[in-house]
Amino acid sequence: MTKIMVVDDDKDATSLFEEVLKAEGYEPILLNESVKAVSVAKKELPALFILDLMMPEPDGFKLCRMLRKEPEFRNTPIIIVTALNDTDSRIVAIGAGANDYLTKPFRLDELYVSIKDHLEDL
């Protein structure tokens, strides 16, 4: 089963991601603390990351850069899912290494298409 790591400090959001990812046949790895994300990722080796941006340190921008510095995650797709709907945040996230940027609230089909598209590229 394909592992997808979700890092979001909002427990309601991670519960929703757990439900929708399992329904699509993925194995979600859920974290509400970004500080643990890199160490857990090295153990679990997810095929894709879904990150929120607005989290306590490290925030999603910094976490994205941290993941890209790790050799095993240089090419792992990262999808940002955030309430920040401004061009500057989008530019910074893509510059930090994100592959896609979805804004909350998002449509489930939008998320599914992004996940499938990025996993097919691997």
What is the role of each PLM region?
Residues 15-23:
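Charged docking surfaces used in two-component/phosphorelay signaling
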Residues 25-32, 40:
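Short hydrophobic/Thr-rich beta-strand motif most characteristic of the beta2 strand and flanking loop
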Residues 106-115:
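C-terminal output helix
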Residues 44-50:
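Active-site beta3 strand of CheY-like receiver
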Residues 14, 55-56, 65, 74, ...:
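The feature encodes the CheY-like receiver
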